[in-house]
Amino acid sequence: MPGFTTHYLFGVKAYNDLPNNYLKHVISKYRWLYQLGLQGPDIFFYNVPILRHRDYRNVGSHMHEYQVNDFFKNSLLELSEIRSRQQKEEAAAFLAGFMCHYIADSICHPFVYGRIQFQTDKKKSECHGLHAALENDIDAILLWKFKHKKPSEFNQAASLCLNTQESQFVSRYLSRCINRTYYQITEKNNFQVTEGMVARSIFAIRFGSRILSDPAGHKTHLIGSVESIFLKHPIASKKLVTDKLSAKVHEILNLDHEVWTNPWDHSIASTASFPDLYQQTLKKCNAVYYYLNAFLIANVPAGPPDMSALLAELGNYSYHSGLDVG
């Protein structure tokens, strides 16, 4: 997946590209919720107790691979059932950011996995470090290009300054959307995502982004030294955010247009560079936001507005492979 900063930058550009419509007004009004949405289900990857699960209860991982279109359908249904105008707009701003995250992941993630030559039949732990390092490099390059800042000069946590009311609302809204899609109570399932889980995940991503900051590279060197004793493939040290790139820019972004393949389907080969995929992502966001705005302004006397065009534009793709999840 693109990293924290890349998702943020995608969202800023997608917002700036919007015409002066209702959706743009809503996002500007509730920018913190939009910016939280830009991190998508990744917020759950910072919540350590959730990560202990290796099955469908690993919320962030499960959402990346299953019932993707159903989640957006249920999120729109939940939104349409909200009576408060303020809360309806808060949900819309958050959901717009979430959609941007999904689009960026489904388009750019195959590039990341392809470039590190990920093999689906091997343990994911072997590629975690390479994956994180490439994401951090892309973060650093785009941050310098668009903000003229180094990673050490960009406070990720400051992009998530929700107030208490916003945090409480989005915790309730997101938990309802997730449970409606993935965790309805049945004879076989008694697990659900609580408002508290979401709230703790929001806190965790803000806290985690501070912990992972390593401007001078001291943490990276120390943790890397310890990891080298116990691990063949470093993980934690590669996730730390530094100002140093691990390779040359043209290699990181594939500016030479070398061939890479989708690890989940090697018949899908591409020479696309990351800038190519960046433009593709923004084009897709523009189309999705057009239909989302139409959904939000539709005046339907009874029941939710028609969402078929929006759901069709979103598709049903894995956040990891970019392939249809069926």
Label each residue range with its predicted role.
Residues 1-97, 102-326:
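N-terminal leader/auxiliary helical segments
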